[in-house]
Amino acid sequence: MKDLLKFLKAQTKTEEFDAIKIALASPDMIRSWSFGEVKKPETINYRTFKPERDGLFCARIFGPVKDYECLCGKYKRLKHRGVICEKCGVEVTQTKVRRERMGHIELASPTAHIWFLKSLPSRIGLLLDMPLRDIERVLYFESYVVIEGGMTNLERQQILTEEQYLDALEEFGDEFDAKMGAEAIQALLKSMDLEQECEQLREELNETNSETKRKKLTKRIKLLEAFVQSGNKPEWMILTVLPVLPPDLRPLVPLDGGRFATSDLNDLYRRVINRNNRLKRLLDLAAPDIIVRNEKRMLQEAVDALLDNGRRGRAITGSNKRPLKSLADMIKGKQGRFRQNLLGKRVDYSGRSVITVGPYLRLHQCGLPKKMALELFKPFIYGKLELRGLATTIKAAKKMVEREXAVVWDILDEVIREHPVLLNRAPTLHRLGIQAFEPVLIEGKAIQLHPLVCAAYNADFDGDQMAVHVPLTLEAQLEARALMMSTNNILSPANGEPIIVPSQDVVLGLYYMTRDCVNAKGEGMVLTGPKEAERLYRSGLASLHARVKVRITEYEKDANGELXAKTSLXDTTVGRAILWMIVPKGLPYTIVNQALGKKAISKMLNTCYRILGLKPTVIFADQIMYTGFAYAARSGASVGIDDMVIPEKKHEIISEAEAEVAEIQEQFQSGLVTAGERYNKVIDIWAAANDRVSKAMMDNLQTETVINRDGQEEKQVSFNSIYMMADSGARGSAAQIRQLAGMRGLMAKPDGSIIETPITANFREGLNVLQYFISTHGARKGLADTALKTANSGYLTRRLVDVAQDLVVTEDDCGTHEGIMMTPVIEGGDVKEPLRDRVLGRVTAEDVLKPGTADILVPRNTLLHEQWCDLLEENSVDAVKVRSVVSCDTDFGVCAHCYGRDLARGHIINKGEAIGVIAAQSIGEPGTQLTMRTFHIGGAASRAAAESSIQVKNKGSIKLSNVKSVVNSSGKLVITSRNTELKLIDEFGRTKESYKVPYGAVLAKGDGEQVAGGETVANWDPHTMPVITEVSGFVRFTDMIDGQTITRQTDELTGLSSLVVLDSAERTAGGKDLRPALKIVDAQGNDVLIPGTDMPAQYFLPGKAIVQLEDGVQISSGDTLARIPQESGGTKDITGGLPRVADLFEARRPKEPAILAEISGIVSFGKETKGKRRLVITPVDGSDPYEEMIPKWRQLNVFEGERVERGDVISDGPEAPHDILRLRGVHAVTRYIVNEVQDVYRLQGVKINDKHIEVIVRQMLRKATIVNAGSSDFLEGEQVEYSRVKIANRELEANGKVGATYSRDLLGITKASLATESFISAASFQETTRVLTEAAVAGKRDELRGLKENVIVGRLIPAGTGYAYHQDRMRRRAAGEAPAAPQVTAEDASASLAELLNAGLGGSDNE
């Protein structure tokens, strides 16, 4: 017995490991894995079904087919364990060794491994520095390659055709050595001296100047060094021995009817063995060269197909014309080993069923059908029955449960009590898609779900199904209860707002309950308290909506956190007083003293959580729900067709619009407007008409006139059911009501363009055939879009998770002083997001000072919670520098201070939290709500773009930033800088509005002046760009020669003449090199200098510029010298929605990106080429000027002689994130990506916290390119993990050496995932072959840092509750202790023993 226990212990031991290394296998290594050579292609004997000897399933090589039994049956039973049968040669052992024992095939001729040959860049090609085409010609026996030139004029690695080879043979005899096939390549690889080659290349690298050559050399050096360091030998890329997969991993399964289903691998192996054996025979017979060669080529192709079918030439197909699945196909793709079996395992103990509503459940409960619970909790019931002595054996217990005896139900009740179960709804888009509940047994067959958690699951009850999982171990139950219980997940991890919010009926009920109504029964009473209000309502003496006075007792927390009561008489309604009874103590009465809509209820729950904490909030949420349901039922709100009131004015509005359209049509026919303008105008007219109709309709629905107590008419908010549903936020929106009772409006074609005839009818009037047909267009597009959107959104989430999966909070504080400035998001006149929303839950990076003083308001390293934010608002701070994950200094991971508050819990984040995955889920989950289409902005929107003035909305004072300006003759400011911003500051010093002011705008008010709301503060001409003079004086033309550089035009209407500068293409030969300009001189004819510089005021004019001055006229500063017409951009497509988010995270370059200044300096233009002009920026300090060629059609924002700063926009367009990173730095690119992504989500009304996007940006900035290696081991131009460079530099600086300089790289998320340090994670993501090839050649080690790698190797993840386990492992490793031996308990031992004996008895026990 003791012996047996020891044996059992040995069976369960797993190796502790820290890292996984991948490398090339040497032939000796393959032989050492192998248990014997497979010599025959046979599989099993068709009569006896026993494996053939030496075949692909041979029992002698791979092990016995039955447990502890040899093939011929001489030795059976456990007692012969380890004996090798002398008759059949099979070792007596467990049959599971057939899953792990490998065989091998000795190849008669070496063959190249296709991965190292064909996976680009070809490793063999790179190593030998030969083109892939040549290597292929050698390998597939079309050409010879010279291996040793000897004394001849043949070079090593020279390719010879058959004829050339024969000629050379005649000429030189056997002085040289040339071969073909894999042997030749093997010989070349073998004879390479890697170290020497490396030295030589490094020397070449230092000498060469050409960029392409440098790149090529660096690539080769990296590969050679990888070989040297990893200990791989180049010749191992050529196979001489082929390993054979264990047979149980490529099984042969008998189907009924005597046929067999086989794995494709067996076919592929059979081909290889057949060809190999044939080749051996041919070599023994010394067959003619050409036959042997053909056989060798066929063997090479067979091995190729086995390793990666279809990579070269046509894929080998099986009997049914389907390509065979090779070894490479087994591991890659969605159905491959990684994604199907390692990352997507199935879970035991689960049931699934349809869900229904459980309106009487508490928040932490779910209803579980009895039948289901009985099945799921079987093991626990068996155990309990035995423990109570109600059943003697498991088998008896099983019988009792099957009989469903009465005692079983009692025991089920006991077992289930306090045992949480997990509920999951697919698709699980974020972590709230799986939550734990305590089961309540119910009759019926459907799971009951608490209505408030539906939002988190995105569940509805139209037939959705959910899965139930039972956590078995104590630890699992603990985690489910402490972390996953629905009551612990009240806030959404994406934005920190409550996600347990009432919706639909509950909202409608509460809204109905808290509305007031004029002259309702009982109006004007004074009540002693909510109890009396309820009594009066129940006894029918007062209406729910009656306006009354009630004595209310509020409780408020004082400084010590004690509750202090305060009683007052409040004007309120009966319904609100009744609702007050369920509000927990500590909240103010004002919270319910209003008509409660969805937003207000959400805010109420949020306030409750922040003030009172978790428990009262959960109880409150449940009470809200019960009350809401009760009063929604009492309200009797229902929808009738008469509720959709069509406004009387609708008819006249539509006829007015039709008249306007007819007028435009006439103008078009008489040629006054173009077709495009007509289309845009028509659409604008209809859009405006639609708005007017819907406004009339909403005004109509919104109010009703009633008689009050004094007999006068009074308007009040209407009790129309449809309006109440929309107003409360329960269901529907103004846009939907507009289609019911207004007009349906303009419809879009499937390509996104708008049909110019709108649907003037609404659903109440009904649609005619044409209108109905137009509607189907849009409806179908909606469905098609949804299907596409789901797939795209899922793929985006997958990429995001993959790039961020290894980011975990690993330390408390990294101590950095870096951070990003947070300012409110202001677009035009609206504050889109106030500062408090942006900084809430972040940690300050430096002290926040009270504006205008040196007093510290908030010290650095403070977590800004609600109270701090109130303080910031009171002092109207408008910029705070906060810590950010992008600037965090932790090496592998992030520190808690840089991340800030854990949004789902409301306190600073814990160590071990997997913030990367949370960020990815938070961004990906709303993905399906984003739109798919690109917006064709025509009509209304493009007109808004051509603004010509700024009109402020609020009163306040003006503040200008980055401004250069001159004062013109009428005393107004004229802007002469490019990126001026105008902000409106209110009396508290808060920024309310912000606008961009273009060059040449005339300001009505100066910096710091007061303005009133609605005042126009700036004007400009949107269609031309002016050239403004900064000095006063007289105009002097230079190089303005009529007919050569300029031409005179006269306007027919006004009779004024103007000069137009010719484009250099249109000029005569003499005018090509002239540069027309306007110079400003004083009365004596001397140059006037631009103030503050020593440059003469001379303005060069680009082509097409229009000058309306004559030579010698007097002008004053701020006047317009010339105008450059701007082509209006036409209707540009604006990528919106999901594709835009994907573009940003993939860091794709836009089509025509903005051109930014690479350095600071003075702009001038050099010699032009045919289609481009040469822009030269000369630095002020006299270093080398920077030149760039810019296509002629790009509009430039800068004039000659202007000063630009690095990163300024030279030509407008969408900015490329890579340029922003290079020229303006990490913080600028973070800000850009965060703001752009937020714009898309904000448009859809989705709230996501900035830090999630920052987390992804941090991962995109993970790599750096070495600019100068210093004393480090890096190569120039090499791309390295940013943290690696930091660590290396730290060590070098500690030793007083020079560190490497580097530039940060921005990689798209796909690129970044594939470029991670972990090859396991990258291989399981995409491009498996390429990743594994690269890793094997470099002999990479995977340190198993991320979550994915650990899941794949089957360990706890180093995050969450697994974080402690990994910390403990690290600590023990550092202390050098052995891991604690797994203790085998008596139960384990007896269980394994029973299993063993059962197996040994040949499975006679068939219960």
Curated annotation (Swiss-Prot):
Cellular component GO terms held in the UniProt record: DNA-directed RNA polymerase complex
Catalyzed chemical reaction(s): RNA(n) + a ribonucleoside 5'-triphosphate = RNA(n+1) + diphosphate
Residues holding Zn(2+) 2: 814, 888, 895, 898
Annotated Mg(2+) binding sites: 460, 462, 464
InterPro entries listed in its UniProt record: DNA-dir_RpoC_beta_prime (IPR045867), DNA-dir_RpoC_beta_prime_bact (IPR012754), RNA_pol_asu (IPR000722), RNA_pol_N (IPR006592), RNA_pol_Rpb1_1 (IPR007080), RNA_pol_Rpb1_3 (IPR007066), RNA_pol_Rpb1_3_sf (IPR042102), RNA_pol_Rpb1_4 (IPR007083)
CDD domains per record: RNAP_beta'_C, RNAP_beta'_N
EC number annotated for this UniProt entry: 2.7.7.6
Binding site for Zn(2+) 1: 70, 72, 85, 88
Cofactor note: Binds 1 Mg(2+) ion per subunit. Binds 2 Zn(2+) ions per subunit.
Cofactor annotation: Mg(2+); Zn(2+)
Enzyme class (EC, first level): transferase
Gene Ontology molecular function: any one: zinc ion binding
Modification type N6-acetyllysine: residues: 972
Stored Pfam families: RNA_pol_Rpb1_1 (PF04997), RNA_pol_Rpb1_2 (PF00623), RNA_pol_Rpb1_3 (PF04983), RNA_pol_Rpb1_4 (PF05000), RNA_pol_Rpb1_5 (PF04998)
GO BP term, pick one: DNA-templated transcription
Record bears the keyword Transferase: yes
Keywords assigned by UniProt, alphabetized: Acetylation, DNA-directed RNA polymerase, Magnesium, Metal-binding, Nucleotidyltransferase, Transcription, Transferase, Zinc
Family statement drawn from the similarity comment of this UniProt entry: Belongs to the RNA polymerase beta' chain family.
Assembly and oligomerization: The RNAP catalytic core consists of 2 alpha, 1 beta, 1 beta' and 1 omega subunit. When a sigma factor is associated with the core the holoenzyme is formed, which can initiate transcription.
Purpose of the protein: DNA-dependent RNA polymerase catalyzes the transcription of DNA into RNA using the four ribonucleoside triphosphates as substrates.
Stated name of the protein: DNA-directed RNA polymerase subunit beta'
Species for this entry: Escherichia coli O6:H1 (strain CFT073 / ATCC 700928 / UPEC)
Gene transcribed to yield this protein: rpoC
